[in-house]
Regions:
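Short, Lys/Arg-enriched N-terminal segments with co-localized hydrophobic residues
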Residues: 1-10
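Short beta-strand segments
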Residues: 16, 42-44, 74, 98-101, ...
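Glycine/threonine-rich flexible loop motifs
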Residues: 104-113
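Glycine-rich phosphate/pyrophosphate-binding loops
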Residues: 123-145
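Short, Asp-centered acidic motifs that coordinate Mg2+ and/or phosphate
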Residues: 95
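A cross-family phosphate/adenosyl-ligand binding-site feature
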Residues: 13, 24-87, 91-92
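Electrostatically charged, flexible surface regions
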Residues: 144-257
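Alpha-helix C-terminal capping segments
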Residues: 84-90, 117-128
């Protein structure tokens, strides 16, 4: 691979993920983004899917430089963003791109996603950020095609900026580029939860459990991320950090507290 510290413009892009530094998605993404500028990769040293916005506070972190501009951190995606911005990068990045995730990050599931959380952390630090996911769990998905989409979105962000308190959640169908439908700006969808705990017994008679054994069923509503992706559109959802339910403020203000 090309050394990631070299690029063709003065833009500096930081890349991270939650699937780990050796995942094919992050390798395809980092290579593709080189056409926009200098790329530094700071990613977990192993799988950290569903880590959410967790931050390591009660243990030391270790960093391993695998090659120039390519760092593995024994922490979460949020740890990686902090380490990159505050310690490893020589300059403050112009953009943080998290991905390419193995599997979509849609609807309510973004609250679990380490991929989305990394972009959220960058947004908290005032840095434009994009989370990118491919709708496949296979290692041989169309990551190169997804990386091309990520570059197009990143170029728009670097050129035009983003509205205040906004980062992007991009979900890409797993198909060749010529089979993708035009990108759509979408809203976050919802799903019907089918939460299930599977309990088993090991050979020594002790119980163990698996969480989340069934695929989620998303509500296929027009305008949502799921609806777009299900029809092979690239879904681009603008997200922000304010979780306040403003309509509920009016209702709760009438409580006799």
């Amino acid at each position: 691979l090309t050394p990631f510290s070299y690029g063709i413009t003065n833009m500096h892009i930081m890349v991270t993920n939650d699937d780990g530094i050796h995942a094919p998605g992050i390798l395809a993404l980092a290579e593709a983004l080189l056409e926009l500028g200098t790329v530094t990769v700071v990613a977990p040293d192993r799988e950290r899917s569903a880590a959410g916005h967790s931050l390591t506070l009660h243990a030391p972190l270790r960093v391993f430089e695998l090659r120039e501009g390519f760092y593995a951190v024994d922490g979460t995606p949020t740890d990686c963003v902090n380490m990159g911005i505050h310690n490893l990068l020589p300059v403050r990045p112009d953009l943080v791109v998290s991905g390419i995730n193995h599997g979509p990050n849609l609807g309510d599931d973004i609250t679990y996603s380490g991929t989305v959380a990394a972009a959220m952390e960058a947004n908290l630090m005032g840095i434009p950020a994009i989370a990118v996911s491919l709708s496949t769990y296979e290692r041989h998905g169309h990551f190169d095609a997804a990386a091309e989409v990520a570059v197009r979105v990143a170029r728009q962000v670097l050129t035009n900026g983003l509205p205040a308190d906004t980062f992007l959640n991009v979900n890409i169908p797993d198909c060749p580029a010529n089979e993708m439908q035009p990108p759509l700006i979408t809203r976050q969808g919802t799903r019907s939860f089918i939460g299930k705990i599977v309990d088993k017994t090991d050979p020594r008679g002790r119980k163990y459990y698996w969480i989340g054994s069934e695929e989620p069923e998303f509500n296929d509503e027009p305008g949502t991320d799921f609806h777009a992706l299900n029809r092979r559109h690239v879904s681009i959802t603008p997200l922000h950090l304010d979780l306040t339910n403003y309509e509920s403020i009016k209702i709760l203000s009438g409580w006799n507290l």
